[in-house]
């Protein structure tokens, strides 16, 4: 059995808390979130923390923080897989009592010896337990594991929504362990029990789990449970087509936040990594949720392309509401450990936004362009800007100050006054703009000098010119 079209969609993201939220895991979470949200379903979060030696509370919090930054809200409380160990063991015992699983007393040393001999003789190393059909009366008083009785004939077909039908001969499946000799459940059992108990209808995960699906299907069949829809998505590779690694750049979601990408841009970019909707590249959440379907996921690995991410990031900054940009900038500063913007700086940034966001790719670009409004007097020019404030330039700026004193503070008037002064000295406007930028912003790359003057206002502009000419 499998979920019907009428079943409410329930997806899940189930990371192991052994490190940061990987960019590949973030995309898996996004695909699950989009699929559920676009169908009015639920997106659940399960922390697969059964490996106590490697699982940490810090990693769990990093996963939560990464998902929150990405804006991937989950329904209900996050589930701890480790807390369900008793339930997982209960299912294994039920299968044993139903004759669909059995106690195996073969030791690890015996299995190792079998496999070594099989390799030496060129035989299959697939272990077949002699205890599969043994009379319980013959069971020794010794440690045992519980194994499922795998089908030995026929074929298991994984009807995968991305990979297509994947066929695995059942004689290649082993009687996998469900309960270890210490009574603890194995990961493969825990995943299936949790997915069933959580009502998961669609398992969307990386294709590195594809081989697990056939073995997990055995448990669904043995328990008579509805089979979820499987969709195994290709992994993300680096620009060179090789498996993504540190040499390709950032791997953790928190690194992308610290680089200054807006979360909206990351969602857009990650959605396009392996999924497409025609030629659409730039879109928001509402469109992505409406468009996203499993049919649009390709089989080939997607390649990370930071230039494309930069372009999308710039497009999103260009259309974001000013207050959203200010909030995003504060988040970026927090992620890098920098001091937050003051209330006055937030106000100034909002006032200057119209001349900042069009050409910025990321938050650090925008904040650098906003230096003129975020900095306070006296402005300290950087080395490149300082070169334009020579004696001649300071003299011309000193002439400009009284001309601006009573000028109406409009773009046309300011352009006329500055342009007239440049012409009087036989200069092009650009020659006068350079020392003006240095005086007003302390930088050589800034928004238009007239935009800066309008944003700063008359008093602040004149004060900065006075500082520059009297230095």
Curated annotation (Swiss-Prot):
Principal location listed in the UniProt entry: cytoplasm
Superkingdom to which the source organism belongs: Bacteria
Record EC number: 6.1.1.17
Alphabetized InterPro entries for the sequence: aa-tRNA-synth_I_cd-bd, aa-tRNA-synth_I_codon-bd_sub2, aa-tRNA-synth_I_CS, aa_tRNA-synth_I_cd-bd_sf, Glu-tRNA-ligase_bac/mito, Glu/Gln-tRNA-synth, Glu/Gln-tRNA-synth_Ib_cat-dom, GluQ/Sye
GO biological process: glutamyl-tRNA aminoacylation
GO MF annotation: an example: zinc ion binding
Catalysed reaction equations from the record: tRNA(Glu) + L-glutamate + ATP = L-glutamyl-tRNA(Glu) + AMP + diphosphate
Pfam family, one: Anticodon_2
Motif range ('HIGH' region): 15-25
Annotated residues for binding of ATP: 246
Transmembrane segment boundaries: none
Key word Chloroplast present: no
A GO CC annotation given for this chain: cytosol
Methyltransferase in keyword set: no
NCBIfam families attached to this UniProt entry: gltX_bact
Function field: Catalyzes the attachment of glutamate to tRNA(Glu) in a two-step reaction: glutamate is first activated by ATP to form Glu-AMP and then transferred to the acceptor end of tRNA(Glu).
PANTHER family hit by this protein: GLUTAMATE--TRNA LIGASE, GLUTAMATE--TRNA LIGASE, MITOCHONDRIAL-RELATED
Subunit structure as annotated in this protein's UniProt entry: Monomer.
Record protein name field: Glutamate--tRNA ligase 1
Lineage: Bacteria, Pseudomonadati, Pseudomonadota, Alphaproteobacteria, Rhodobacterales
The gene coding this protein: gltX1
């Amino acid at each position: 059995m499998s979920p019907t079209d009428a079943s409410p969609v329930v997806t899940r993201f189930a990371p192991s808390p052994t490190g940061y939220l990987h960019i590949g895991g973030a995309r898996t979470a996004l695909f699950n979130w989009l699929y559920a949200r676009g169908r009015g379903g639920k997106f659940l979060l399960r922390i697969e923390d059964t490996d106590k030696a490697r699982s940490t509370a810090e990693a769990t919090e990093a996963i939560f923080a990464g998902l929150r930054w990405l804006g991937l809200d989950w329904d209900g409380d996050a589930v701890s897989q480790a807390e369900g160990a008793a339930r997982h063991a209960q299912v294994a015992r039920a299968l044993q009592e139903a004759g669909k699983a059995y106690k195996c007393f073969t030791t690890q040393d015996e299995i190792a010896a079998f496999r070594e001999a099989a390799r030496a003789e060129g035989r299959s190393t697939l272990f077949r337990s002699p205890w599969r059909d043994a009379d319980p009366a013959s069971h020794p008083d010794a440690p045992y594991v519980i194994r499922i009785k795998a089908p030995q004939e026929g074929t298991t077909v994984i009807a995968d929504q991305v990979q297509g039908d994947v066929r695995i001969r059942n004689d290649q499946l082993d009687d996998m362990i469900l309960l270890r000799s210490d009574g603890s459940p194995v990961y493969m059992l825990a995943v299936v029990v949790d997915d069933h108990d959580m009502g998961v209808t669609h398992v969307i995960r990386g294709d590195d789990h594809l081989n697990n699906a056939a073995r997990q299907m055995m448990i669904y069949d043995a328990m008579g449970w509805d089979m979820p829809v499987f969709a195994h998505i290709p992994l993300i590779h680096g620009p060179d087509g090789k498996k993504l690694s540190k040499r390709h750049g950032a791997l953790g979601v928190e690194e992308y936040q610290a680089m200054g990408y807006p979360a909206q841009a990351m969602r857009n970019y990650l959605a396009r990594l392996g999924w497409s909707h025609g030629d659409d590249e730039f879109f928001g959440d509402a469109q992505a949720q409406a468009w996203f379907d499993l049919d649009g996921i390709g089989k080939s690995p997607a390649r990370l392309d930071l230039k494309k991410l930069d372009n999308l990031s710039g497009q999103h900054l260009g259309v974001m509401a000013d207050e959203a940009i200010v909030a995003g900038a504060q988040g970026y500063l927090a992620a890098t450990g920098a001091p937050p913007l003051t209330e006055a700086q937030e106000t100034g940034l909002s006032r200057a936004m119209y001349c900042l966001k069009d050409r910025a790719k990321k938050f650090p670009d925008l904040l650098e362009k906003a230096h003129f409004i975020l900095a306070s007097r006296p402005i300290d020019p950087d080395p490149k800007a300082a070169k334009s404030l020579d004696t001649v330039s300071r003299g011309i700026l000193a002439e400009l100050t009284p001309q601006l004193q009573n000028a109406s503070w409009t773009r046309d008037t300011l352009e006329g006054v500055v342009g007239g002064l440049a012409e009087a000295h036989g200069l092009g406007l650009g020659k006068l703009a350079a020392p003006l930028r240095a005086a007003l912003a302390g930088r050589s790359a800034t928004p238009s000098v007239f935009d800066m003057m309008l944003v700063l206002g008359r008093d602040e502009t004149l004060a900065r010119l006075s500082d520059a000419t009297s230095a």
